């Protein structure tokens, strides 16, 4: 492949499911909201030299559109309404919304436009960045290398799990955004389907369609971040986001992300009504055992049987960490493990990129993420962070994200 001339992405469905799920909610509720998002490399690598290749790929994305077979596939799922699907059929990526440059060796990317458009850029753009960088750095790597590594991990999993009932272990593929390549992700998931009976789905809609897997995903941090400016009351913004999601999806897609403003602040908003309506919670930062214990205790305090709810773990998981969590919690609550980078970019000699794209403004005003892991905190306005901390009683000193 020539990453300067050959498109990495061949389908608009090659993205995470929750992007379409959120886009539908935005289409119905926040059609005119404007946002800005910014790229960040948490590993502080100098990726600016790849800006030209990434720009070329972004320009090629203007040709992606929902084809008839893909439209029929989405229409057969229980998540989508016809007005949204008809709109998605007309959607085209607009590269003018994306500014990409090499800024003193750093890769600088900013995306600005209507939220309903910007929302679809994040995952495919991150996948493009990852594949461009790895293709340039490690052209000798093959899909066979990735599959061989996966087989080693599956053998190890079987060994460490011999003494435990693993019938309730559930694995999801969350590996699109930081994959080594599209081909590696597709081959790894095909191998899991053949050899790992605990795979229950993928976050990638193209993979789900082509491999006959359930597509899985609910909402991301941006859903809660945008509500910090959409809601007239900052202190009520998280509750407003939770309610708006239920209004859009009253009986499905009910896993709530808990760490936009720390788990403790989330649980204060996640009262009896929300706790009963949502099917469970997703962990994405902080100590996972401590988080899980808090979640179970919260359900018990509300008189809810934890075995009727599900905890999804998705923070930097690998098979060892997932099994440790399964061993700790499996008899007390339902569990699902979303593994991403350690499925789709776990290849000997390859260092995965630690890259994200996050909202920084909504309707021209700042938004913030105050997660349970200091390294995942995203904020660009100290005054707003102070206001957010005060509104949610978060005793955390936040440093500006670089």
From Swiss-Prot:
Keywords: Ligase, Phosphoprotein, Pyridine nucleotide biosynthesis. It comes from the Bacteria. Its EC number is 6.3.4.21. Pathway: Cofactor biosynthesis; NAD(+) biosynthesis; nicotinate D-ribonucleotide from nicotinate: step 1/1. InterPro entries: N/Namide_PRibTrfase, NAPRTase_N, Nic_PRibTrfase, Nic_PRibTrfase-Fam, Nicotinate_pribotase-like_C. Signal peptide: none annotated. SUPFAM superfamilies: Nicotinate/Quinolinate PRTase C-terminal domain-like (SSF51690), Nicotinate/Quinolinate PRTase N-terminal domain-like (SSF54675). GO terms for cellular component: cytosol. GO terms for molecular function: nicotinate phosphoribosyltransferase activity. CDD domains: PncB_like (cd01401). It is an enzyme of class 6 (ligase). GO terms for biological process: NAD biosynthetic process via the salvage pathway. Transiently phosphorylated on a His residue during the reaction cycle. Phosphorylation strongly increases the affinity for substrates and increases the rate of nicotinate D-ribonucleotide production. Dephosphorylation regenerates the low-affinity form of the enzyme, leading to product release. It catalyses: nicotinate + 5-phospho-alpha-D-ribose 1-diphosphate + ATP + H2O = nicotinate beta-D-ribonucleotide + ADP + phosphate + diphosphate. The modification Phosphohistidine is found at residue 221. Catalyzes the synthesis of beta-nicotinate D-ribonucleotide from nicotinate and 5-phospho-D-ribose 1-phosphate at the expense of ATP. PANTHER family: NICOTINATE PHOSPHORIBOSYLTRANSFERASE. Belongs to the NAPRTase family. HAMAP family: NAPRTase. This is Nicotinate phosphoribosyltransferase. The lineage of its organism: Bacteria, Pseudomonadati, Pseudomonadota, Gammaproteobacteria, Enterobacterales. The gene is pncB.
């Amino acid at each position: 492949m020539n990453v300067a001339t050959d498109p990495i992405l061949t389908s608009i469905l090659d993205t995470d499911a929750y992007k379409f799920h959120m886009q539908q909610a935005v289409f119905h509720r926040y059609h005119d909201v404007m946002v800005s998002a910014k790229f960040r490399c948490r590993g502080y690598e100098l990726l600016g030299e790849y800006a030209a290749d990434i720009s070329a790929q972004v320009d090629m994305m203007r040709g992606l559109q929902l084809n008839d077979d893909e439209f029929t596939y989405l229409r057969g799922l229980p998540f989508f309404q016809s007005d949204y699907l008809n709109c998605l059929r007309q959607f085209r990526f607009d590269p003018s919304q994306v500014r990409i440059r090499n800024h003193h060796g750093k890769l600088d990317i900013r995306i600005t436009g209507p939220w309903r458009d910007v929302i679809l850029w994040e995952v495919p753009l991150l996948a493009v960045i990852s594949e461009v960088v790895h293709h340039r750095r490690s052209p000798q790597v093959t899909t066979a290398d990735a599959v061989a590594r996966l087989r080693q991990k599956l053998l190890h999993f079987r060994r460490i799990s011999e003494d435990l009932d693993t019938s309730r272990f559930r694995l999801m593929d969350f590996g699109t955004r930081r994959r080594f390549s599209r081909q590696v992700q597709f081959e790894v998931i095909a191998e899991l389907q053949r050899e790992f009976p605990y795979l229950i789905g993928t976050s990638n809609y193209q993979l789900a369609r082509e491999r006959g897997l359930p597509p899985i995903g609910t909402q991301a941090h941006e859903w809660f971040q945008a509500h910090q400016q959409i809601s007239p009351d900052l202190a009520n913004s998280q509750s407003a986001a939770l309610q708006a999601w239920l209004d859009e999806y009253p009986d499905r897609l009910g896993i709530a992300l808990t760490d936009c403003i720390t788990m403790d602040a989330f649980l204060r908003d996640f009262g009896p009504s929300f706790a009963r309506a949502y099917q469970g919670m997703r962990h994405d930062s902080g100590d996972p055992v401590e988080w899980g214990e808090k979640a179970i205790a919260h359900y018990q305090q509300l008189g809810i049987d934890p075995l009727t709810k599900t905890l999804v773990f998705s923070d930097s998981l690998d098979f060892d960490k997932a099994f440790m969590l399964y061993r700790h919690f499996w008899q007390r609550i339902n569990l699902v493990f979303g593994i991403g980078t350690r499925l789709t970019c776990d290849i000997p000699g390859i260092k995965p990129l630690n890259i994200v794209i996050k909202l920084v403004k909504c309707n021209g005003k700042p938004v913030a993420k105050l997660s349970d892991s200091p390294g995942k905190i995203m904020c660009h306005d100290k005054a707003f962070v102070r206001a957010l901390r005060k509104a949610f009683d978060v005793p955390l000193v936040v440093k500006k994200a670089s």
